[in-house]
Amino acid sequence: MSVPTTSTIVVSRAPLAAAIWAVLALGGCATFSKDGGFDSVSQETRTRLDKDVRWTRTAQERAKSDGQVAELLRRPLAAEDAVQIALLNNRSLQASFDELGISEADLVQSGRLPNPRFTLRHASAAPQVDIEETLSFNVLSMLTTPYAHEIAKRRFTEVQNAVLIAVMQLANETRQAFFSAVAARESVRYQEQVQAAAEAGAELARRMVAAGNWNLLDQAHEQSFYTAAGQRLTEARLTDALAREKLLRLMGLPGDQPDFQLGERLPELPPRIEDLPDIEQAVLQSRIDLRLKRTQLDELVRNLGLTKASRFVNVLDVGPTRVQQGPEGAPYERGYEITLEIPLFDAGGPRLRRAEALYSQAVERFTQAAIDARSQIRRSYAAYRAAFDIAKRQRDEVVPVRKAVAAQNLLRYNASLVSVFDLLADARDQIASIDDYIQSVRDFWIAKSELDAALLGDSST
C-alpha cells in the first residue's frame, strides 16, 4: 500500500509538489550541530572581553578548565584573572549554556516531519465482518513546518544572545566583586593601624591619669576613640570576609578552596578618563540586550504570519483508507479519508487579535528599551566621571593636606607646642584619609565596570 509523504512549507501559491519537496529537504537537514550553537558565544566573548569561555560537557573539557583555573590561582589574582576563572568555573553559567542544548533540541524537533497515524476498526456479526484501516497524516502540521522551523531558529538565536548576556553579566559582577574584595582587604590593614594608634593613645591616657598628670574626661575621650576604632576594625573585617566570599562564589570556588592571593592594591587611577562614546552607535551596534529584543520582535512577526496562515483551519488530516464489508474474505474497498475542522464557532479571530496585540506590545517595549539603553549609558558615564573626579581629589588634595598637617604637628611637637595625643589624632586622621581614598578608587573602578557593561548591553547595571 503506497503512503503519501508529508512535510511543512510556508503557505504560498507554490505547487503542492514543490511544497512536499521543500518539506522533505527541511526534514532531511534537521540535525544537531557539532558545537551546539556555542561557537558564536565563544567567539563573541573573545571579541568583547578577550576571555576564554568553555562549555564543559565532557570530563576532558572539565579537566582542561580545572587545570587553567589552578594555573591562575598559583599567582596573585588581578581583576581579569578573576573574570577568567569565573567564566571557566561558574556552574550557573554552565547551566545557562545547557539552555543552548535545550533550544537546539527544540530546533531540530521543529524540522522533523510529523508521524503518521494508523487507525484500525474491526466489527463483526457472523457472517458479516466490517474492517476499516486508515493511515492519516496531519497535512496542516506539514504545511506549517517551515514556519515553525523558522520560528525555532529565531528562538535559538534568542537563546544564544541570552547566554551571551549571562556571560557579560557574570564578567561585570566578578570584576566589581574583585575590586570590592581588594579594597576591603586594604581597608582592614589601615583600620588595624588606626586601631593601634587609638590603643596607644588610650594606654598612654590611662598611665597619665594613674600618675595624676591627666584628668578623667580627657582619658574618656581617648578611650572612646579606641572603642570606636575597634568597632570600625570589626566592621572592616566583616566587609572583607563577605567581599571575599562573594568573589569565591562568583568564581565557582568551594569554601574549602586553599587561600588564594589577591593583589595587594587596587589599580592606580588612569591619567585621564575616556570620552563618552557616541550613544546612538553604541546602542545600535554593541548592546546585546537590544539585539535580543530585536530577535524576539522578529519572532513575533513570524508568529503573527503563522497565526494568519492557520487562522481558519486548525485540523486537516489526510490519508489512504481501505474498508472490508460483507462476508469474511470479501475484497477491500480502497479510498481516502479527510478530517477537517469546520471553523463554525471559532474562526480564529481571537488568536489573530492576540498575536497582533503581542506584536504591538513588543514594538513599544523595544522602542522603550532603546530609550532606556541610551539613558543608562549617560547615567553610567556621569557616575564614572564623578567617581574619577572624587578619587583624583582625594589623591591630589585631601591625602597630601592631611600628610602636611601631620608633618607640621610633628615639628610643633618637637618644639613642645603640642602633645603626643595631638600626634596620635593626626595619625588617625591621616590613615582615615588614605582609607577614604582607597574606597574612592574602588568606586571609580566599579563605575568603570558598570559603564563598560552598559555599552555591551548588561541592563542590570
Summary of predicted features, one role per range:
Residues 29-53, 84-141, 244-253, 280-365, ...:
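A small-residue-enriched
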Residues 63-68, 118-123, 186-191, 262-264, ...:
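A ubiquitous short alpha-helical element
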Residues 91, 213, 288, 312, ...:
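Residue-level recognition of short, well-ordered coil/turn positions
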Residues 106, 113, 120, 162, ...:
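Soluble, cytosolic/nucleoplasmic coiled-coil alpha-helices used as oligomeric scaffolds and tethers
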